[in-house]
């Protein structure tokens, strides 16, 4: 008949994402969502933002708790470790980080998740954490370079090393940065 229970689908997808999250307070990577296999990567890690959108539809507190765990535990780890590109976990729970490249799309994803959480939760600490992530665009990054140009509106694609900027400014990078700027004002 064409009826579709999207609430059920949202719940199932949300539970699936949460199952791919480390939930162990004794684990350094507590709160991390795996993106692929045994790996988290900076590129498009939109689980938190997607889960917040799911929470707004379902009001399922387990979804909100999952994103709060990510924000309280994993995001500070990412910030302290200068926004790594990738984290891979071995079968013995040892992990390795790859520091670069760092891309605007990756930082924008973390920022959006935190910003959405701060709005839903009305919590200033999450808003401040989102601002700590946004500072990457303003030069608080491993290259110590401002990534966004106020005069032209462009954003550089990313960072390829401690002092090496990818000065391309493709649509994806610029849009991610501009969306982050726009949501800061909201």
Kindly give the residue locations of the regions a language model identified.
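Glycan-recognition and catalytic cores of secretory/periplasmic carbohydrate-active enzymes
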Residues: 1-186
């Amino acid at each position: 008949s064409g009826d579709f229970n999207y609430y059920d689908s949202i719940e199932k997808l949300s539970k699936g994402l949460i199952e791919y999250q480390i939930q162990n307070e004794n684990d350094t990577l507590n709160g991390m969502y795996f993106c692929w296999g045994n790996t988290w990567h900076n590129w498009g890690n939109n689980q938190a933002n997607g889960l917040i959108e799911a929470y707004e539809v379902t009001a399922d507190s387990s979804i909100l708790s999952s994103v709060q765990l990510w924000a309280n535990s994993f995001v500070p780890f990412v910030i302290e470790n200068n926004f790594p590109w990738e984290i891979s976990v071995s079968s013995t729970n040892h992990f390795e980080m790859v520091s670069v490249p760092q891309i605007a799309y990756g930082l924008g994803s973390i920022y959006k998740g935190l910003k959405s959480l701060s709005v839903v939760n009305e919590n200033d600490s999450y808003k401040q954490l989102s601002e700590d992530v946004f500072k990457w665009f303003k030069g608080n990054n491993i290259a110590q370079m401002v990534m966004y140009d106020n005069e032209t509106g462009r954003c550089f694609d990313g960072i390829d090393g401690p002092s090496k900027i990818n000065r391309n400014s493709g649509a994806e990078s610029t849009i991610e940065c501009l969306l982050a700027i726009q949501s800061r004002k909201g």
